[in-house]
A protein has these predicted regions:
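Glycine-enriched alpha-helix->loop->beta-strand junction motifs that scaffold or abut catalytic
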Residues: 187-190, 223-225, 268, 303, ...
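Proline-centered flexible-loop/turn and helix-kink motifs
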Residues: 156-157, 188, 215, 264-268, ...
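Mid-to-C-terminal alpha-helical segments outside catalytic/metal-binding sites
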Residues: 2-36, 41-53, 57, 66-117, ...
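Active-site gating/metal-coordination segments in enzymes
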Residues: 116-253
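Catalytic metal-binding/acid-base residues of hydrolase active sites
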Residues: 60, 197-199, 232-233, 277, ...
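Hydrophobic faces of well-ordered beta-strands that scaffold small-molecule active sites
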Residues: 55-59, 118-120, 161-163, 192-194, ...
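Aromatic-lined glycan-binding groove of carbohydrate-active enzymes
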Residues: 261, 267-301
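Short aromatic-enriched loop/helix-cap "lid" or pocket-rim segments at secondary-structure transitions
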Residues: 65-70, 132, 204-206, 239-242, ...
Length: 398
């Protein structure tokens, strides 16, 4: 995502009838629910979504109303005088403002590009964990997550929530357990974003495999929710946020996993590395060789717990990803409206219209179905239940 700041996005505010979408989702998750009831096992087999179901596992709220930026600006200005800090309930944003913020952007693009729904979280670069202290992050995360919840309530057919965690440099991630539990149990969220570097590009905290992270992993396993490894804004001028810091975070996380026994300790923990896995697929041979030289298990063992998304913005990149990484480990994603918003002059299409690349890849239909929907339903076990609970019409129709 681009650094936090107001964005405008114009477009049509009308919506298509909700009935068609709900029918698609209901058909898509029917096999999933049936398999759970019949098998009664904690790790269900992948569901069998109906043709056309497309789940975008990586979307951020990047078209926020101006009032949210004003609240955050007040919060940052009060860091030296906490008595002046705004309270969460000082933020006043109407439902109409929320609708206006997404109807001409995310919802319009969902309709145009054929995406069924988006797993939605606060702006990644806006998490700003390097700003202030743990109390700052706690208040900011709560405000940000509550807005996502309101959007998922207004548009239950379009958005399902994933939470921002109140991480802070030098603070053990155990402090994030309460917000994660609140978001999952009270707000109906189905996952979280984990920042491997809350310092914003200075990498001062322990790696993701350090035992200081174990309390949050224990809570994730208890709640049966996955995490997406996602850095926030860069506070280091050496690293452009979306062009360097993001890809560095993705690649660094994968190498940390190779050199650790994290998944021996948490065999059911599921972690998603976004942006196509950073540099990992391109250097797959390097990582296989390093694992071998270090007497670590083969990468196929790591893939029991690690997944990659498709936020890769050209056809050759997606072709490489799908040739190197098994289809079972790839989740469809676009990150729209996100890091790259322009039109590719070579194709005449938007860079972030990633569904076109999956459609254009040389894949068997079974693999395409897995990437578009089946894998998301498997990696996010709470997704099917969340969608089933939302079949009753409410809010503004799609």
């Amino acid at each position: 995502m681009s650094p936090i700041g107001p964005r405008s996005f114009s477009g049509c505010s009308c919506c298509m009838p909700r009935r068609r979408f709900l029918g698609t989702v209901a058909a898509g998750i029917a096999g999933f629910a049936a398999s759970q009831a019949a098998a009664q096992v904690p790790a269900p087999s992948p569901p069998s979504p109906s043709p056309g179901l497309v789940i975008d596992c990586h979307g951020h709220y990047t078209t926020e109303p101006q009032a949210l930026f004003a609240w955050r600006k007040r919060q940052i200005a009060s860091l030296n005088d906490p008595a002046q800090a705004p309270r969460p309930d000082d933020l006043k944003i109407s439902d109409d403002e929320l609708r206006q913020s997404v109807e001409g952007a995310q919802l319009k693009l969902q309709r145009e590009r054929g995406t069924s729904l988006t797993i939605f979280s606060p702006r990644a670069s806006g998490m700003g964990h390097h700003i202030g202290n743990a109390a700052t992050s706690e208040a900011w995360s709560r405000v940000s997550n509550d807005l996502i919840h309101r959007l998922t309530t207004l548009y239950p057919s379009n958005f399902v929530g994933v939470c921002q965690l109140p991480q802070s440099p030098g603070v053990a991630p155990a402090n994030c357990r309460a917000e994660l539990e609140r978001c999952v149990k009270e707000l109906g969220f189905i996952g979280c974003n984990l920042n491997p570097d809350p310092s914003g590009g200075h990498w001062r905290d322990p790696p993701l495999t350090d035992r200081s992270w174990y309390p949050i992993y224990e809570k994730m396993v208890e709640l049966d929710v996955p995490g997406m490894i996602h850095v926030s804004a860069s506070d280091n001028p050496n690293f452009h946020a979306t062009g360097a810091h993001y890809i560095n975070g993705d690649t660094t996380a994968f190498m940390q996993f190779i050199t650790s026994d994290l998944f021996r300790d948490f065999p059911t923990l599921r972690l998603i590395i976004p942006h196509g896995g950073g540099a990992v697929p391109y250097h797959w041979g390097r990582y296989r060789g390093l694992a071998q030289d270090m007497k670590r298990p083969p990468l196929t063992q790591l893939l029991r717990n690690v997944y990659f998304d498709t936020c890769v913005y050209h056809q050759p990149g997606i072709d490489l990803l799908t040739r190197v990484v098994p289809a079972d480990n790839i989740l469809f994603a676009s990150e729209m409206v996100g890091a790259v918003r322009g039109v590719d002059p070579e194709t005449g299409q938007s860079f972030d219209d990633t569904k076109r690349y999956i459609d254009g890849a040389s894949l068997p239909e079974e693999a395409r179905r897995k990437i578009f929907a089946e894998n998301a339903l498997r990696v996010f076990p709470r997704l099917a239940a969340a969608l089933s609970a939302r079949n009753a019409p409410s809010g503004t129709p799609r």
